[in-house]
Amino acid sequence: MVLMKDEVEVIGFDDAPFNKADKVCILIGTYMRGNRIIDGIYFRKFKKDGMDVTEKIIDIVKEKHYKKIKVIFLAGITFGGFNIADLWEINKETEKPVIVVIDKYPNKEKIFLALKKYFDDADERIKLINSFPEPEKMENIYVQYVGADKEFVKNVIKKTKLKSKIPECLRISHLIGRGFLGLR
């Protein structure tokens, strides 16, 4: 078993809801100690369906709390439509484990059809998605991870959940994102 303090420092990223007509989306990062103490909230704008969310995530992680952050959580691999977070690049540039948490196993066939229909660079995006580890079921969620082993992932998820099935940093980023709905 991997030993880890209860207040392990993590950051979780999600995007705010967006409309079809939007060209820009909002990325939310919540930095927490364990599952109870919020020590930072970060925002970045990124292009809907672009390919810039990876650099935005890296920029946030490398800010004030960089040395303290032990894990980067992502609420999926796509943000703002099909802006794909490159797990390998995030891990390489930050030297931190990256853990993707999702509710359901993704329907890759459906995703790839949409990419081929709407994107000139669909092959590049599909290749990137296919390079990631397959999602695996862990209790009642699915996870993909880079830069960590399964035991570490199980342990850090357990330490960062409160009453939800997902880590608090992701839950709070999601809640903050929903707050942007009122601004429309």
From Swiss-Prot:
Pfam families: DUF99 (PF01949). This is UPF0215 protein MJ1150. Belongs to the UPF0215 family. It comes from the Archaea. InterPro entries: Endo_dU. It comes from Methanocaldococcus jannaschii (strain ATCC 43067 / DSM 2661 / JAL-1 / JCM 10045 / NBRC 100440).
